[in-house]
Structure formats: structure tokens, C-alpha cells
Amino acid sequence: MKAGRHISASQIVDIQDNSHPYPCYGGNGLRGFVEIFNEEGDSLLIGRQGALCGNVQRVGGRFYATEHAVVTRGKESVDLNFAYHLLDWMNLNQYASKSAQPGLTVGKLSKLKVLIPQIAEQHRVASILDRFDRLTNDLSSGLPAEIEARRKQYEYYRDRLLSFDELAA
């Protein structure tokens, strides 16, 4: 677990191109694109400054993490998707300093104690939570699933409400 590094705002562009291929993440998500990367691989980023500090996001590939983000990687005994859901559920913002500019430090985050189940259970839990996450946050899969659920609900109530034969008997 470590903090990202400073990069000048003048080095960040809004649109990805051949000379700025790497996403640049700050404490609250994607800031833009840069020429260089300082991290590589699947990671979790935790926002460390501002009112939204403590938010957690999954990133992968080559990217640049600014000083406003804490970068953490999984270990063999920890499923990164499980860790994402656990950290998100923990509401890390509650551990932020109570100042004009709330903040989290790597030191404070690394002292938090959590219980981690066996890796097989982590995979199972992460798989279930990932499915729910997709259904609730991804319009391409969530919306059709919601429409299908409402269609079934409609058919159920339609069949119940329009079954006059049962009422006459």
C-alpha cells in the first residue's frame, strides 16, 4: 500500500491519444491521460483527500496514480475483487482526519484490521457481489434484467387479476 506521485496538471490531457495513452487517476477517479505510467497491473485505488476520500475503485493495466490516491494490490491469499467490496463496505471515509481538507494516510489505512475468509470463500462472495454490482450499475446488463423482472411481475399480477373463472366458482 502506497500513495501515488505528484504530476503537474499541465501534463494531463482530457482525451486519450497516441502521445498520452495512460489513464491518470486521482483520489476521485479518472483525471485524464498522461505520457507516462507509474503503476502496472490490477490494483485498488483509495481516494485519500477531500470530502470523498475513502472511495475505492478497481483499475488495471498501466496507469498513473497521483498523490491523491493510495494504491494497493492483492496478495495471493486475498482476492482483489473481494478486497474491493470489503473496503467499499467499510466506508473508509469514517477514518479520515476531521479537518478543513479531510484526508486518509497510508499509515492510518495500513493499521486497519479486517477478518479475511479463506480464498475460496472470498471468490464466492466476490462473484455474488460482482453480479449484483453489474445488475445495479451497468445499464447494458442491469436494465434488461430489470425489464425482464418487471415483465414477469406484470404477467404474474395480470394472471392473478384477470382470472375471473376462479372468482365465479
Name each model feature, range by range.
Residues 1-169:
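Charged, alpha-helix-forming regions
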